[in-house]
């Protein structure tokens, strides 16, 4: 399923960034991208997503994205990268994890696909500054 995840995620490239959205070609945020790939590969989303603010519960310290990832995705070791992995990022020390992406390439030039706030879904180098922020690595569950 790894390459299928990347193909599905790349279909979202260029989709404008829209907070709380998940509509291919019209608008999405980082969670919306993961939701859209889920729908494309697996089917209906496993739970309704409540409204959320851009700070992702930072004031309360609740790890909402991490909790959802642990409920619905398959946890992987951080040091076992594969194309198609869902990546969870903690943007700064002490903050909640609040950004998601999908690893598209591994090896000497790793890359990931993510919804870039204020812009669109892009494929970016998974440079050292980004890689150091990864706090979770997950796989989509197998269908069925």
Task: Give the predicted meaning of each segment.
Residues 83, 108, 133:
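Residues that flank catalytic or metal-binding motifs in active/ligand-binding sites
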Residues 100-123:
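Catalytic Cys-His active-site segments of thiol-dependent hydrolases/isopeptidases
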Residues 1-78, 83, 90-92, 96-98, ...:
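N-terminal capping segments
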């Amino acid at each position: 399923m790894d390459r299928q995840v990347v193909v599905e995620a790349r279909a979202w490239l260029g989709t404008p960034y829209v907070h709380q959205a998940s509509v291919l070609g019209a608008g999405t945020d980082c969670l919306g991208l993961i939701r859209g790939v889920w729908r494309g590969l697996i089917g209906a989303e496993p739970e309704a997503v409540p409204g959320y603010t851009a700070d992702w519960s930072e004031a309360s310290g609740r790890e909402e994205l991490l909790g959802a990832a642990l409920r619905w995705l398959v946890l992987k070791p951080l040091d076992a990268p594969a194309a198609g992995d869902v990546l969870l990022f903690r943007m700064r020390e002490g903050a909640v994890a609040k950004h998601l992406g999908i690893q598209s390439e591994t090896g000497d030039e790793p890359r990931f696909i993510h919804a870039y706030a204020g812009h669109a879904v892009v494929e970016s180098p998974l440079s050292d500054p980004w890689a150091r922020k990864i706090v979770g690595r997950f796989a989509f569950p197998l269908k069925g």
